[in-house]
Amino acid sequence: MSRPRKPKGRPISGWLILDKPLDFGSTEAVSKIKWLFKAQKAGHAGTLDPLASGMLPIALGDATKTVPYVMDGRKIYEFTVAWGEERSTDDLEGEVVRSSADRPAEEAIRALLPKYTGVIAQVPPQFSAIKIGGERAYDLAREGETVDIPAREVEVFRLSLIGSAPSLAQFEIECGKGTYVRSLARDMGRDLGCFGHIASLRRTFVAPFGEEDMVPLADLVALEKIEDEAERLAALDEHLIDTGEALSDLPHIAVNDDQAHRLRMGNPIILRGRDAPLPTPEAYATVQGKLVAIGEIAEGEFRPKRVFAG
């Protein structure tokens, strides 16, 4: 019987909040970060198109267990819409499919914003990762198929016009999971009777991470010049954010070393006293500030669902 292979790389855990440059895919970015940090595993919390820049949260090691909590968080984008053309991809990359010589007045743009605020029905772009009959919509679109993608409910918490010129308008949006900014540009262009597509897109916030957490890729690549590997990896690790920061919106309990050991073995712990937290389907436990487990609080117990190495 063969022995199980040891995973390659370092067993590090944490979040790297990358400021992704333009013309760089999300999967490519994750591979680059995994290689730089010599991490055993890595994953991202929400695709950012190659034509978009900005925040790409990348989880290393055990932090990949917390990716769903970041993917569900609010996001903020700054984007520019170019009026006069609707494109097949709803951004600069696609072919022009409709055009107009009309341009919207700033007052008309502002009057339209309330329609796209709150819970709205939105049809994702033809070139998107939505699955239709088991296949990605973008694969079908590349084969020349026009597919009927059903509308989905998404939530827009805030949509602001921050600048306007005859053929361009700059916006900022705070939105929930699953919102396509490209679809928003397409739909606003149709409503204004002039058509439109995304000319630039930058993500500046993915809850709970902010702009101050972002690290430019060039800064990380520059550390490759450090010849001593231990010194180089230590310099890279300084940019990591603790795994537990991704869970800051969940209820939290602090446990002692004995309780942490029980949780890591998959066993529940009893919560006593008048300060015991109320029942909740999800909470996280830490010992001395380090993440131990995600679980539920029920019947006076914390019951672990996912555990993290010490």
UniProtKB/Swiss-Prot annotation:
Q: What keywords is this UniProt entry annotated with?
A: Isomerase, tRNA processing
Which reaction is the catalytic activity of this chain?
Answer: uridine(55) in tRNA = pseudouridine(55) in tRNA
| Active site annotation, chain numbering | 49
Its Gene Ontology biological processes?
Answer: mRNA pseudouridine synthesis; tRNA pseudouridine synthesis
Q: Tell me the Pfam families matching this sequence.
A: TruB_C_2, TruB_N
> Which GO molecular function annotation, any one, does this entry have?
RNA binding
Enzyme Commission number, as recorded: 5.4.99.25
Task: List the NCBIfam families.
Answer: TruB
Family to which this protein belongs: Belongs to the pseudouridine synthase TruB family. Type 1 subfamily.
Outline what the protein does: Responsible for synthesis of pseudouridine from uracil-55 in the psi GC loop of transfer RNAs.
Name the record gives this protein: tRNA pseudouridine synthase B
- Native organism is Sinorhizobium medicae (strain WSM419) (Ensifer medicae)
